[in-house]
Structure formats: structure tokens, C-alpha cells
């Protein structure tokens, strides 16, 4: 999403989206 956790690709992020 766009925070600092890690989505599918790893280049994206979670908590912020």
C-alpha cells in the first residue's frame, strides 16, 4: 500500500496505503 510493512511485491508497503 505505501507505509512500512510490505505488500505483495515487497517494493510496496502496508499500514499507510
From Swiss-Prot:
**Is the keyword Secreted assigned to this protein?**
yes
Q: Where in the cell is it found?
A: Secreted
Q: Set out the biological process GO terms recorded for this chain's protein.
A: neuropeptide signaling pathway
Sorted UniProt keywords: Amidation, Neuropeptide, Secreted
A GO molecular function term, named singly, is: neuropeptide hormone activity
Major localization listed first in the record, in broad terms: secreted
Query: What are the record's GO terms for cellular component?
Result: extracellular region
Locate the Leucine amide modifications and list their residues.
17
Q: What does this protein do?
A: Myoactive.
Spell out the family assignment given in the record's similarity comment: Belongs to the pyrokinin family.
Q: What is this protein called?
A: Pyrokinin-5
This chain's source organism reads: Supella dimidiata
Print the organism lineage.
Eukaryota, Metazoa, Ecdysozoa, Arthropoda, Hexapoda
Amino acid at each position: 500500500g505505501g507505509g512500512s510493512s510490505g505488500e505483495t511485491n515487497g517494493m510496496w508497503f502496508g499500514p499507510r496505503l
